């Protein structure tokens, strides 16, 4: 075997490390080409796929399905209970009588009797006591039976109302008759009454509020 030339020996390690372009020499003068460097992304791709697979595996399992099952069942149960409550309320309203007796004993018409509103029980007008589940006629009968003074009080109020209505009608008839006899006199009386009413209700309180009544003679 021939001896290797001195200039083709193996270079020192320091020189190879300092200059990256210098290729390492082999025996026989042949130079070895460096292996192609793999990209960083190609090296990291298998590791990233393994990490993603390990993270995605517990989520895709049967755990979410088992977790969503009780929640869906509870929501369905609440919806069914609400529907049953609404149906019970509608049935209770439909079971109520369509007519009620008024204070005079004659039936009281209700808007729910019409064909158009028969299917809408919530639009029927109800007595305030009906909201509390109290029948108005039974409540009134119980009140009249246990409080003997109530019938007398009611009759007294009815008498006062009747007398007031009769007096108003009599005054209206007298006013019409007087106007037919002397229209000019009635017009003057109406004007005088209007001025007097305005002075008593507006002008006099304003004078007292401003303090001008001290300078006005009260004679």
From Swiss-Prot:
A GO cellular-component term linked to this record: nucleoplasm
Domain of life: Eukaryota
Stated role: Interacts with EP300 and acts as a repressor of MYOD-dependent transcription and muscle differentiation. Inhibits EP300 histone acetyltransferase activity. Acts as a repressor of TGFB/SMAD transcriptional responses. May act as a repressor of the TGFB/SMAD3-dependent signaling by selectively blocking formation of TGFB-induced SMAD3-SMAD4 complex.
InterPro entries from the UniProt entry: EID
Single annotated GO MF: transcription corepressor activity
Domain notes: The N-terminal portion of EID2 is required for nuclear localization.
Name of the protein: EP300-interacting inhibitor of differentiation 2
Stretches for region Disordered: 1-71, 95-115
Transcription regulation recorded as keyword: yes
Positions with biased composition (Basic and acidic residues): 20-34
Lineage: Eukaryota, Metazoa, Chordata, Craniata, Vertebrata
GO biological process, one term: cell differentiation
């Amino acid at each position: 075997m021939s001896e290797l030339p001195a200039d083709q020996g193996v270079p020192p390690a320091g020189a190879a490390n300092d200059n990256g372009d210098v290729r390492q020499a082999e025996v026989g003068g042949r130079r070895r080409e460096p292996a192609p460097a793999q990209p960083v992304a190609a090296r990291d791709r298998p590791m990233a796929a393994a990490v993603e697979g390990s993270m995605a595996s517990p989520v895709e399992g049967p755990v979410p399905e088992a977790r969503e099952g009780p929640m869906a069942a509870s929501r369905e149960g609440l919806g069914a209970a609400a529907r049953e409550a609404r149906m019970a309320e509608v049935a209770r309203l439909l079971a109520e009588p369509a007519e009620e007796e008024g204070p005079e004993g004659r039936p009281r018409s209700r808007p729910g009797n019409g064909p158009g509103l028969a299917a809408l029980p919530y639009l029927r007008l109800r007595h305030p006591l009906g909201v509390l589940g109290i029948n108005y006629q039974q409540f009134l009968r119980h009140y009249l039976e246990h409080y003997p003074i109530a019938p007398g009080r009611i009759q007294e109020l009815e008498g006062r109302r009747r007398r007031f209505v009769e007096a108003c009608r009599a005054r209206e008839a007298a006013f019409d008759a007087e106007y037919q006899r002397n229209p000019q006199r009635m017009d003057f009386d109406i004007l005088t009454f209007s001025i007097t009413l305005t002075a008593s209700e507006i002008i006099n309180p304003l004078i007292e509020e401003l303090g001008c009544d001290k300078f006005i003679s009260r004679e």
